[in-house]
Amino acid sequence: MVEVTLLGSAQDGGVPQVGCDCCLDLEQRYPVSIGLTDAEGGKHLFEATRHLGDQLRIWGCNSVDSVFLTHAHIGHVDGLGLFGKETMAAKGVNLYCSKLMLELIERTPHWSTLLSDGVFIPRVATVYQFPGVIVEAIEVPHRNELSDMHAYLIKAEKTLLFLPDHDTWQETLRGHDLRAWLNHFEVDIALIDGTFYSADELKHRDQSKVPH
């Protein structure tokens, strides 16, 4: 049976977030991540956060077959190093990402060693097939200082959209309304960017500089 497990739902910094005094007493929440279990028990992790150990514990496993990355912003990738020799000492983990994301990994010394050491095997495509499930990458607009951004459609008996970050619905939908856009991709379940409740949420910062 194909299953998706929610492993985190917070923005890059998690909760409580460093530098924020309004959430110190809130229950801890991990940065956004999901785990996909395919029909033969293969484990596919979406995003590599700094809370990798806690999130694998939630998932009930201590290793994964593959990692999917949506983009290069810190909360989605700062757990990559935990797969290396200092921690997990993993080998042969498939790494699914865009061409631009892979190029960034290759020119970042701390990450490129994960490729040369055989920790990750990079796989660049737009459609990936596993037992009982297909994963399709969809490019969406989001601050591309370092790489592009891709959401993922996970297609099994039902279709789930994993869209943890984007800039604005106007740019993502490109003239379509939200319901029509979701219907076009035959989405049954949508996990979407909910970083900000309102445009006035950030104190002492210009929210237009960090669109979500």
Label each region the model flagged:
Residues 159, 167-212:
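Cap/insert and terminal regions of metallo-dependent hydrolase folds
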